[in-house]
Amino acid sequence: MTSSPHDHVLPRRARLAVCLLFGLYGVILGTWTTRIPAIKQDLSLTDGALSLGLLAFAAGAIIGMQAAGRLVDRYGTYRLLLPVALADGLLLVSPALAPNLIVLAGCLLAFGITHGLLNITMNTAAVEVQRAWQAPIMSSFHAVYSVGGFLGAAVGGLCAYAGLSAAATFLTVAAVVAVIAPVAARWRLAPSAVPVAETGAGRGGLPGVTFLGVLVFCCLVGEGAAADWSSVYLHDSLGSTPGFAAAAYAAFSIMMMAGRMVGDRLTATLGPVRLVRYSGVLAALGLGTALLIGHPVAGVAGFGLLGAGLACIAPQVFSTAGGQDPARAGQAIARVASLGFLGFVVGPLAIGALAELIGLPAALTIPAVLALFVAAAATSLRPRAPHPATAAPVTT
């Protein structure tokens, strides 16, 4: 049976739509992180008070992810993508308008919820588009997210340099979201021809999904460690200048983005199991060797290799989790993403606590060891047989 040209038009548009949403997600988060110091200054917050506000954001994200799983499976990504994206852009503005810490915490809780909702909704939509595309394309979506994060950070930095307030910065980004999200929503993939309620799915557990979440947890411990500790390691442990120390996280981010840009081709060539196995080994050897050498240049290279190694792991795990039972993809991805987010938050804290006992260089071996664990457990990404009632293809 041959496909008509029209059969490929909507998947292409749907892929572009999801790419745009991943990009917006990255822009929102990148802009927010660069303007956190302005929020702190405007409200005269101590480090501890700011931490409470950021904890509210993290709690909201977990709540949003958990709620999104069931909402997506019940109502579908088609209905949820646009309102969730618009809400996330709108609530980005709210922290900049908060008059005190209590209101700030409430705003960040709400912002975290919509951010978690958008995370799960767009990742589930990506799995749906990949299923319709019939080829590995998940890494490309995450590459666009990385690009969006860079753009958002650049926008936030330029606005800060120009003396614009955080509120003006966030309003600008919210306006961009309000323009682009409806355009993307017009091209989103149509819902499946088989309604979830008629498939008989949704009963019993999701075999293996929790373990897949553990793999993403391990991966995001490495991402969090690079974000929070790479520059500190180069500056405090290796004695590099602050400017050169910042190159460690820059190398990590650039190599992660580059890895995701070629991730789909690598997936098609190697398959998810071998790709994740080789990726885990690359991440572990790169960081581990750099820690053994103990030189600033080696440190930058090591964190770059860590980024390259971790780049394709999470997209492959999301693809595997979302493909096990398409009718419950939202719940599966929510479980995996929640565990991953927990790793991103808890991992750096654990490394910091351990560094007090054994030193930062030794504590930073944790991400390397976890990357080796992911490599050893890569066989868990072998595809399971789809649920018989949900094996129908996505219609376009």
Describe the predicted segments one by one:
Residues 63-77, 160, 259-272, 355-356:
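Helix-to-loop junctions at the C-terminal end of transmembrane segments
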Residues 44, 76, 97-102, 239, ...:
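Helix-breaking motifs and short loop linkers at transmembrane-helix boundaries and internal kinks
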Residues 141-189:
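Helix-loop-helix hairpin linking two adjacent transmembrane segments in secondary transporters
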Residues 39-40, 71-72, 158-163, 234-235, ...:
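Interfacial helix-cap and linker-helix signal at transmembrane-aqueous boundaries
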Residues 63-102:
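Conserved MFS/SLC helix-loop-helix module at the cytosolic interface between two early adjacent transmembrane helices
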Residues 8-35, 41, 109, 206-222, ...:
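Pair of pore-lining "gating" transmembrane helices in MFS-fold secondary transporters
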Residues 34-48, 228-244:
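Short amphipathic helix-loop junctions that connect adjacent transmembrane helices
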Residues 117-131, 312-325:
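Intracellular juxtamembrane helix-capping segments at the cytosolic ends
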